[in-house]
């Protein structure tokens, strides 16, 4: 690419500075038949098969956030830290290659094994799960949706008896175990919806919490902004404007990281140049 032509390629830099750790991020990697194929997040979601397991039974869908870009960054971050730790004992840096495609292919391991073992791809079911029931979003009275994911028969027993209010459902042959519940998903979902629609969102959340049933609310960006668990921090832009953004996810006992202001274009260019003189 342009950096190599200018003499700033990763290999060139490590030749001059053997302890340097470099990381190249590309769409499909430095080798292979797709190495020169242009790549965007959406395109890689489709090429990797991620879009094929996302969406409804009628149509595949793009994941709503740029998962390829984000995953590539996280993979690069972890690999750079690994190389830095290795350098502490070896004294040498390393060259790292991360691609959007490899990151998503790694995510598809379970789907690929499903294809190999069952001879068919995982069934696409929106917010539901092809192998677990009940699992999905259910509307409640007054608006909103509750999502549940019953993981075992013991949890189903508490849910059926204490939330749905019908102990007979526990021993009902249609719902006696997960396989039966998956087979009779339609009948089971109808029962759940009928009960859930009798409650408003806050009342049902309290009942589920009291009964130790795992649940969530189907939130949008506005609801996330108002979430009581959400942490935010101020961030100063180059023009002096201050935005409230979501805080970094990792927290340390020694104290949370303090973010400095967003740098202006070229603000640290000279400082970086001096490091390589």
Where are these regions (language model features)?
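Active-site-adjacent "lid/gating" segments in soluble enzymes
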Residues: 4-150
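Alpha-helical scaffold segments in soluble metabolic enzymes
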Residues: 76-83, 158, 162, 271
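Conserved PLP cofactor-binding pocket of PLP-dependent enzymes
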Residues: 209-232
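Flexible, small-/acidic-enriched active-site or ligand-binding loops
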Residues: 235-277
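Short, surface-exposed loop/helix-turn segments at secondary-structure junctions
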Residues: 115-123, 227-238
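Short acidic-hydrophobic surface loop/beta-edge motif
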Residues: 136-141, 233-239
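Aromatic-enriched alpha-helical interface/lid elements that frame and gate functional surfaces
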Residues: 134-211, 215
């Amino acid at each position: 690419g342009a950096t190599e032509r200018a003499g700033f390629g990763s290999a060139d830099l490590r030749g001059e500075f053997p302890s340097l750790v470099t990381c190249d991020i590309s769409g499909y990697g430095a080798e292979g038949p797709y190495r020169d194929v242009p790549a965007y997040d959406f395109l890689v979601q489709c090429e990797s098969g991620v879009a094929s397991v996302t969406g409804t039974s009628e149509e595949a869908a793009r994941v709503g956030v740029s998962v390829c870009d984000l995953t590539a960054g996280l993979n690069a971050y972890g690999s750079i830290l690994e190389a830095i730790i290795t350098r502490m004992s070896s004294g040498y840096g390393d060259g790292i290659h991360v691609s959007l495609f490899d990151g998503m292919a790694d995510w598809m391991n379970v789907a690929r094994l499903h294809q190999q073992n069952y001879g068919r791809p995982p069934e696409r079911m929106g917010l539901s799960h092809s192998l677990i029931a009940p699992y999905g979003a259910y509307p409640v009275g007054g608006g909103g949706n509750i999502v549940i994911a019953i993981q075992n028969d013991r949890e189903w027993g508490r849910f059926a008896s204490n939330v749905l209010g019908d102990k007979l459902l526990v021993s009902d042959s249609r719902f006696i175990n997960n396989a039966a519940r998956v087979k009779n998903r339609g009948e089971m979902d109808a029962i759940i919806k009928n009960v859930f629609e009798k409650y408003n969102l806050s009342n049902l959340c309290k009942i589920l919490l009291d009964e130790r049933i795992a649940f969530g609310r189907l939130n949008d960006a506005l609801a996330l902004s108002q979430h009581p668990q959400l942490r935010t921090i101020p961030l100063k832009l180059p023009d002096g404007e201050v935005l409230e953004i979501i805080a970094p996810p990792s927290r340390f006992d020694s104290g949370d990281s303090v973010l400095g202001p967003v740098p202006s274009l070229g603000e640290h260019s000279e400082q970086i140049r001096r490091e390589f003189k």
